[in-house]
């Protein structure tokens, strides 16, 4: 891959993808049960063997298109292998944020994690630790009173969706405060990568950090060009965080001077903006519409002389707003063409959650055949991946990837 001056270079949603972050599906998916899957934000239980096969097709398409793949488990391993002290610090922080309360169990877990190779330790942290894996473990009174479950350390099945814990914006990142407690531990990995990894530790500004007051998730962060962002206000991202991100970007004198905040309904089906709205070509977007799906649009700009943010509500349609701020006419391809039945079905299975690997070239789930056909009829090249198992987590190709470097357009 050609060299870039910065390890993060994201100034669009569609520039040719050069480097991306993924996670290989692991044993964490095997630790989901019907009794706990809702708590972990899954609507069904994926079959790991097939999920891995589907994910490998995804990775193969990326590689065949000359995209360099980093895996988050490999990056954190490269961080921890450099220092025993750092490994011990990471173990202690991970256990603390897993809310282990008794000194006895904390010490058992420290000994257990330290006994593993770093790669196996990271895999086990993601997949979860059950009581039988800790020798000499006994339930405390607190465990018995509060009904401790099978897991001492809960699994993290949503690590599959690398889009959300941090997001690349320009040459920096937001390390996100996740909306649900069950996902907050995922951001420890990003914290250590951007603080300690030799490639990233001194070269990547942090626009927002993981302990902010309000939640922000990467599925709501879209970079349209060097001056324009679209941020969703959704089930998972709060308005406060959008304003705080705007302040950070403006005061750090980045190239971004306008943020469009798209408010969407707080609904499980539309958990992030990118489940209903993504860019796929210079002037082409895909979106889902229904009776209960609407966009309220707010514009945030900065006045350097007064150091204040100006916020106004747009009254125009989304298409007209985007055309104005992009300076060109845009088209929107509706999920399944707006069909009431196919549109709802395909949006539920991430028909709008596609990953652009170049202008007018995307990766999409094969199951969304109506929407995919519409894309092709409108000149979009579609790489299809199987998704009978991956789709059970309610995330598509965009959700499963975090671009690190795109070519500028």
Curated annotation (Swiss-Prot):
Keywords, sorted A to Z: Arginine metabolism, Cytoplasm, Hydrolase
Enzyme class: hydrolase
Annotated GO biological process: arginine catabolic process to ornithine; arginine deiminase pathway
Catalytic reactions on record: L-arginine + H2O = L-citrulline + NH4(+)
A single GO molecular function term of this UniProt record: arginine deiminase activity
Keyword Hydrolase on entry: yes
Annotated compartments: Cytoplasm
Enzyme Commission no: 3.5.3.6
First-listed, main subcellular location of the protein, grouped into a coarse class: cytoplasm
Similarity annotation: Belongs to the arginine deiminase family.
Protein name, entry field: Arginine deiminase
Organism whose genome encodes this protein: Borreliella afzelii
Top-level taxonomy: Bacteria, Pseudomonadati, Spirochaetota, Spirochaetia, Spirochaetales
Name of the coding gene: arcA
